[in-house]
Amino acid sequence: LISSDPANMNYLTGYDAWSFYYAQCVLVHINEDEPICFLRDQDAGGAYIKTYLQDKNIIKYPEKYIHTPPSHPYEYLVEVIKQKKWDNIRIGVEMDSHYFTATCFEKLLTGLNRASFHDSERLVNWIRIVKSDSEIKLMQAAARISEKAMKTAFDVINPGVRQCDAVADIQKSLFNGTPEFGGDYASIATLLPTGKGTSASHLTATEDKFVKGEATIIEISGVHKRYHCPMARTVLLGKKNQKKIDTMKATNEALDSGISAVKPGNTANDVAQKFWGVLDKYGIKKESRTGYSIGIGYPPDWGEQTLNISKGDKTILQPNVT
């Protein structure tokens, strides 16, 4: 298996650094005692510090491969695989990983023409969906940070305040964390669509000021040791709008109904049916999913890209699924 998703690399080895913008991966072979971390030379020190791997399982490629096309780090990876005599076997790759580029795959196909490549279908992501008790504690720490930062958001988002100033305070709260748990950078920027922007879920802050009577969506995540626990809330500034208030009440009722179905043995679809059953009762339409699996995250996403709380998702909920 060649795993290029930085969250999977972290899960498999403990590796944690802002180096995912260029080629890196973890190799997993059934006959090897440990995974192998493949990184650029400049970042290998991070693997010595952050991972549990023996030095021999940290392989670094020379800096001459950085942004010097047609040369590419995966050419070096091909030679590593050949040296280990793994060039005539089935190899799984993460075809839809954000950081597994077309060039990465092309170099593998060209350099390892005796191997057969197969989509791993998010194998590691699906393993990550069920957390250990220790991971749950990290998720709970992230949740406490989210709660604190959301309270900060409620305090600082007011008519006349610039959006960017509010985000500065929110970010400070997220990084400060709590006395027990320090914060970390999130995989997604603070999302703050306001006014007409609430029709587009993923807008970030501008220098514009908040306006009395408008709604603002706040989507943030506390992060502790790369584990995320996102939270989203909507606030109305000043002047009441009964339609928005009624919609919020119905949405909260739908959330409570969905949460009541979050039990081991139920499916994600069971939760979704309870949620949308309430929305349907009030004539409210929502086309997008209402939840997804979370855990370790790196930009550009804190979702695990597996379970969705949406109609038709038959994933069975288990203890410690987050």
Residues covered by each model-derived region:
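Active-site neighborhoods and metal-handling regions in enzymes and metal-associated proteins
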Residues: 1-322
